[in-house]
């Protein structure tokens, strides 16, 4: 069972915070995938984890800034399934190994919260191409107000080798924003 404490503590929290989750049938149950979403609030990872955990009972390994690493590796990496972004190469390689072993990895191509990058991060597309893994786009309207957050889950996207990685990343994020705006 993935996240036994999460199910006990955070299922009620997410139930109270998320108004609607659309298109959960698009979450593949027999395929490893890379989850890509927009990033609006600190709780976004919890909101994204909720439908994955309910449908698949699997951990979602999300690339995060190393803010909480004073709690220790056991809590952050093993229990919470975070991938610390100490440096780009380390996070990329760790994500790649997790994907190759059948795990689900979550990435926010916009960069860190509160710092909207003009240039999107291309790691999700590069990982998808290198590991031959599809991307699951999720549009998220995130809120701290109860019954106000919504998720819209898109269909799998298969990035193409040999095509411009930046353009593919932009196309995936346009789909994420379309999903977010059409909830």
Question: Where are the regions that the model predicts?
Answer:
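Short hydrophobic helices that act as membrane-entry/anchoring signals
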Residues: 2-18, 73, 77-82
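Short acidic-hydrophobic, aromatic-tinged amphipathic segments that line or gate anion-handling sites
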Residues: 21-23, 82-87, 159
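Catalytic core of membrane glycerolipid acyltransferases/transacylases, capturing the structured
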Residues: 29-87
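Helix-to-loop junction immediately C-terminal to a conserved catalytic motif
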Residues: 8-39
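Short, Lys/Arg-enriched, disordered terminal segments
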Residues: 1-11, 24-25, 101, 178-183
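Non-catalytic C-terminal accessory region of glycerolipid acyltransferases
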Residues: 31, 90-183
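A generic structural signal for well-ordered alpha-helical segments
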Residues: 14, 55, 77, 98, ...
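Structural motif corresponding to alpha-helix initiation and N-cap regions
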Residues: 21, 70, 89-92
């Amino acid at each position: 069972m993935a996240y036994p404490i999460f199910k006990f503590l955070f299922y009620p929290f997410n139930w109270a915070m998320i108004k609607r989750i659309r298109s959960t049938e698009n979450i593949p149950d027999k395929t490893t995938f890379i989850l890509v979403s927009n990033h609006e609030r600190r709780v976004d990872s919890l909101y994204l984890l909720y439908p994955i955990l309910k449908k698949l009972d699997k951990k979602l390994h999300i690339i995060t800034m190393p803010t909480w690493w004073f709690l220790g590796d056991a809590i952050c990496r093993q229990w919470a399934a975070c991938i610390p972004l100490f440096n780009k190469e380390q996070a990329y390689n760790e994500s790649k190994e997790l994907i190759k072993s059948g795990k689900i990895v979550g990435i926010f191509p916009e960069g860190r919260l509160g710092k909207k990058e003009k240039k999107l991060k291309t790691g999700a597309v590069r990982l998808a191409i290198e590991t031959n893994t599809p991307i699951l786009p999720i549009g998220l309207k995130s809120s701290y107000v109860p019954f106000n957050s919504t998720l819209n889950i898109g269909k799998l996207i298969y990035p193409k080798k040999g095509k411009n990685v930046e353009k593919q990343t932009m196309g995936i994020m346009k789909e994420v924003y379309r999903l977010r705006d059409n909830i």
